[in-house]
Amino acid sequence: KYDKIKGNFFAETPIGRIDVTSSKPALNGYQKSKCFFCYDYISIIKKSKNLCHVDHFFPDTLKGKDFSGYVDGIWNLVLSCKECNNGEGGKFKKLPKIELLERLNKRNEYFISSHHPLRETIILQTGNTIDQRRTFLQKCYNEAKIILIHTWGPKMIKGTPTF
C-alpha cells in the first residue's frame, strides 16, 4: 500500500506496517528500470511520472491463509509499473501466471549467485539449494492457486525483455 503522507510503500502485518520502499534500489539493480511484468520503463525516483510500485508477486491477501511463504519477504517483492500493479486490467490481488514464476525464480537465483547483500535473506526464506528454492516457489504457487483461483498476466509486453 502507499502512504500519501509519508510518501512510502508499506505492507500491513498483524503487528503493524513494514516499509518496503527501501527495497526499491536493490530490486531495481536487477530490473534495470523495467517493470517485472511488462518491461515498461519505471523509475525509483520520487515524484517521477513513471514511479514504480513495490508489488508482492504472491499477493499480500495470502497473509493469514494456508500459505507457506512469508509474503513480505524480499524473495516475493518485485517492481512494477502502475498499470500492471493496479491499473485497468492490472494484477491487483491476482496470482501471476506460471510463466512469471520462472522469472521470479531466475531473479532470486541471480541475487544469490551474484553474492548480492540480499543473498542470505533469500536463502533463509526460500531454501539452501536451487532445488529447495524451486520446490518452495512451486509449493507457494500451488497453495496460492487453490486460494486465489484466478491468474493474471500483463496485457502486452511494452519493452524489450531484459531479465
Where are these regions (language model features)?
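Short, charged surface segments at domain edges that flank catalytic/cofactor-binding sites
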Residues: 1-43, 61-71
